[in-house]
Amino acid sequence: MGEIWSELKAHHSAKSRRKMLDLFEKGNRVQAFSATVDGLYFDFSKTNLDDGALSLLLELARVKGVESRRAAMFAGDKINETEGRAVLHTALRAPAGPIKVDGQDIMPGVLETRARCFTFAQQVRDGSFTAQGGRITDVVNIGIGGSDLGPAMATLALAPYHDGPRLHYVSNVDGADMNGALQGIDPKTTLVIVASKTFTTIETMTNAQTARDWMAQDVADPSAQFVALSSSTEKAGAFGIPPERTFGFEDWVGGRYSLWGPIGLGLMIAIGPEAFQQFLDGAATMDRHFQEADLADNLPVLLALVGMWHNQVEGHATRAVLPYDNRLSRLPAYLQQLEMESNGKSVAMDGSALQQNSGPVVWGEPGTNGQHAFYQLIHQGTRVVPCEFLVAAKGHEPDLTHHHRLLVANCLAQSEALMRGRSMEEARALMAAKGLEGAELERQAAHRVFPGNRPSTTLLYDQLTPFTLGQIIALYEHRVFVEGVILGINSFDQWGVELGKELATALEPVLTGKDDGAGKDGSTLALVDAVKAVGGI
């Protein structure tokens, strides 16, 4: 396996100075470096990959056991080895079973919970479940991490399909987040969803208590307007939420992969069970493709291999996700968690130090906004930032097709500009046309040179529908899985989030003066003193 990595790096070193544009002299470049699956068109021809590099990457995937590991995941094997758990978020969108964990078919339970969620969502939507002030007008979803990022992203993405109550998402323990969500809504017609797998997450439970106190000022029985998305029926009950309004999920569903089940209840209420089922169907379609397609034609595998070429082989430590679809403005933040929490590891599955770079820093903003913010660095900065563009061929505003045409033109132009660049000769010609000469021409031309040869991929889809969004999210989930397998890490734990939480719990009594902070470092204690000096804690 080390030999393949060495071959890849040697291949890159030998080819690194060539121009991507020259690769298109081979007539079938676009066909060879693109793939189409169920309405998704993935173009990775604007990269420095060639047949030899792609062949080596595919061999690496085979040698590292992507196919066998994929089969193990779908079979319910406990591939989350550090926690001893199966990884079966895919079961939440599966149409039927059997799917077994520890010899037990989990699908009857999955389908029963899905039906319960759909029934409750429809009751809220049609008014048969009411608040104490009448029909539900607003839903406040309280969660953090996977209990917020996925639902909030998808709810915004599918705004054209909203025909239910208004949705509000609260995640941050910062009181400003809760205060902003509750402004202007009526507690007598508000439903609160508390999303916490353990029902102990400190930020979520703090916000839940605040929401209940807020509601208690105007409502006789606040608990009657609360719903729990949790595996802990007991803790939800202690909070006042009965079992019939508690929707649970099993430990084989990781938080950042949980949107497909009860954690998606808010989205179900917003768009309705039928549209949510289409969302599940899109993801299930991608699951089947990932399971069945040969590696060379497998969209999640190709997405992963391109990413690994850029990160592990070319050494680019960051990846920009650039959706030219304003309703996908939360997708980069969602993918930050999905990719960085999954593959931001330094230890291999066997406990040894990782031999390759782990996952990249993922970030981004929607186009065209980003063009007027950070694209300057992407085009002319000293660091190469591989870019992933996403764009729909068709928008949701038929009266504004000229807007969408301009949006698409900008997206395609950016990918072309990153690859093509502008030479010094071209820049000189531009300055000469403006009447500049001599040293001033040279000086001004230098500022207008674009190095080009900067890689990007484009994911084109017909229109952002529930089905398409399901496909896209599942595509990225499986991409993360493939990258994790090749790196030899566990993509399904997140021990890196624990230490900070433990230290925060210990610091709170220091802030209130109940603990003197013995053993804390001088910097932390000085910051505590500075906060206490201002007051307000």
Swiss-Prot record:
This is Glucose-6-phosphate isomerase. InterPro entries: G6P_Isomerase, G6P_Isomerase_C, Phosphoglucose_isomerase_CS, SIS_dom_sf, SIS_PGI_1, SIS_PGI_2. GO terms for biological process: gluconeogenesis; glucose 6-phosphate metabolic process; glycolytic process. It is found in: Cytoplasm. It is an enzyme of class 5 (isomerase). Catalyzes the reversible isomerization of glucose-6-phosphate to fructose-6-phosphate. The keyword Signal does not apply. Its main location: cytoplasm. Keywords: Cytoplasm, Gluconeogenesis, Glycolysis, Isomerase. It catalyses: alpha-D-glucose 6-phosphate = beta-D-fructose 6-phosphate. SUPFAM superfamilies: SIS domain. One of its GO terms (molecular function) is carbohydrate derivative binding. The active site is at E341, H372, K501. It comes from Jannaschia sp. (strain CCS1). Belongs to the GPI family. Pathway: Carbohydrate biosynthesis; gluconeogenesis; Carbohydrate degradation; glycolysis; D-glyceraldehyde 3-phosphate and glycerone phosphate from D-glucose: step 2/4. Its EC number is 5.3.1.9. GO terms for cellular component: cytosol. The keyword Cytoplasm applies. Gene3D superfamilies: 1.10.1390.10, Glucose-6-phosphate isomerase like protein, domain 1. Pfam families: PGI. NCBIfam families: PRK00179.1.
